């Protein structure tokens, strides 16, 4: 299925091209991608199917690792807040929906502080990456998403 169609179906509140730019930056469109954060263990290879991804993610989380999962690289610490399981986070539609919810929440909070929509979007993207309205701008993440959105 075409990604833009999938994004529209699963996350209609976020422009499909915006979501595509985030996903390209986060996972390179790999639905089974796992990123280990904070100097954690590195995977010797990325999972190639959902069963491998779920098993690897559960093992990493049980071992105390902080990880990002799936297309939108949903952080393991967000699963409870989002009402998701590890199995669900590797469902492409649920992952895109979760990514959109996180971005929407960030945008709502940023908009309350920043009137200009484009500036609020930059801050929302920054928070998507780092949890902070400024760090994702400083570390180049927001620029990378912007560049990926133009390709």
Located regions from the model:
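Non-catalytic cell-wall polysaccharide-engagement segments
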Residues: 1-18, 25-33, 46-72, 76-151
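Early exported N-terminus immediately downstream of N-terminal targeting peptides
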Residues: 34-39
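Eukaryotic N-terminal accessory cofactor-binding modules
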Residues: 42-44
């Amino acid at each position: 299925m075409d990604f833009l169609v999938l994004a529209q179906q699963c996350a209609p509140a976020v422009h499909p091209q915006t979501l595509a730019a985030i996903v390209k930056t986060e996972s390179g469109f790999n639905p089974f991608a796992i990123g280990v954060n904070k100097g954690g263990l590195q995977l010797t290879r990325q999972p190639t199917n959902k069963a491998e991804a779920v098993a690897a993610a559960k093992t990493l989380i049980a071992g105390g690792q902080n990880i990002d999962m799936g297309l939108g690289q949903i952080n393991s610490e967000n699963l409870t807040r989002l009402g998701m399981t590890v199995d669900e986070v590797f469902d492409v539609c649920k992952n895109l929906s979760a990514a959109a919810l996180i971005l929407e929440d960030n945008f709502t909070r940023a908009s309350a502080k920043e009137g200009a929509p484009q500036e609020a979007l930059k801050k929302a993207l920054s928070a998507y990456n780092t949890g902070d309205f400024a760090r994702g701008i400083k570390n180049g993440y927001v620029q990378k998403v912007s560049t990926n959105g133009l390709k």
